[in-house]
Amino acid sequence: MKKNIVCSIFALLLAFAVSQPSYAHTVSPVNPNAQLTTKAVMNWLAHLPNRTESRVMSGAFGGYSLDTFSMAEADRIKQATGQLPAIYGCDYARGWLEPEEIADTIDYSCNHDLIVYWKSGGIPQISLHLANPAFTSGHYKTQISNSQYERILDSSTPEGKRLEAMLSKIADGLQELENEGVPVLFRPLHEMNGEWFWWGLTQYNQKDSERISLYKQLYVKIYDYMTKTRGLDHLLWVYAPDANRDFKTDFYPGASYVDIVGLDAYFDDPYAIDGYEELTSLNKPFAFTEVGPQKTNGGLDYARFIHAIKEKYPKTTFFLAWNDEWSPAVNKGADTLYLHPWTLNKGEIWDGDSLTPVVE
């Protein structure tokens, strides 16, 4: 069911979306029913690498909803650089909690700040550190067998019902954002090629074809639930394997289910990140979907990261740096990262009337 866009900003964005030249090459979301604003953002994002400057959106993680989430990370970035991140992230799922009902691990109270952020010139990102449906709650880092995975995929089992209880509450939160006309960079089931989350592999760099198939089924199940069952048409779907593990594209659910591909990359040398060529070969817009230093001693020079993007990873459309000790604000080079000619910050996505120009 289509939702009315209630803010003049969104109306202007709609006007922008339908006023683009008919000869322009348009990149559309995988959801054919995507809202016009979401379509406009997708096309605009996909064309960022054609620009000569202002072509890589900055991003920061704001924390876990009803836990660590606040605007403090944005404020720290502003204090360090004079700029605010173009993208601000919240995680709806506190998968380590063990309440009586697994759905209570989900919270979306961060939506209020995300709506304000969008209306003032930024874009929200939602991630999910999901609790493990093989248990009554919690255990997001507890490994499960493939047979347990199969039970999670089966809607008739207690495990399947627990998954669907979480998905229902997540969809409620996403619905709030859609009602306000807010497009979302949605990054579920990330770092699946690692062995630390229940939805991923169980052994270090050991390929498991059955596990990969089960993951794809889970991803598609979530996509179908959000898009078809709940009719959410404001999501841009982000596929994000870990840069420090193999099998980065093996888990790829298919071009019909992914809008943006990226790498979650923790590094000491930004010139040595693995997987860029592999991910860009999927012919989707590319991003560094989660970044930070491997050594959390304040020594990472983020200036080298933006220089590496320009020299080695030029198709990058955005980055999202983790908060706390991984933040640019407590490492080196934050000002260079945010003030680099290639970087695009909050307020530079739309100019007050429409999205900034698409460059063919």
Task: Locate each region found by the language model.
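Alpha-helical scaffolding within the catalytic cores
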Residues: 41, 68-77, 108-112, 170-172, ...
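Loop/turn elements at helix/coil->beta-strand transitions in domains of secreted/extracellular proteins
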Residues: 52-56, 83-86, 120-125, 179-185, ...
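Bacterial N-terminal signal peptides
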Residues: 8-17
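Aromatic-lined carbohydrate-recognition surfaces of secreted/lumenal glycan-active proteins
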Residues: 60-61, 187-189, 219-247, 286-296, ...
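N-terminal module-boundary/linker segments of secreted carbohydrate-active enzymes
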Residues: 23-105, 306-307, 348-349, 354-359
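Substrate-binding cleft of extracellular glycoside hydrolase catalytic domains
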Residues: 97-228, 232
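Substrate-binding cleft of secreted/luminal carbohydrate-active enzymes
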Residues: 56-62, 289-360
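Glycoside hydrolase catalytic-domain groove-lining segments
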Residues: 246-298, 333-351
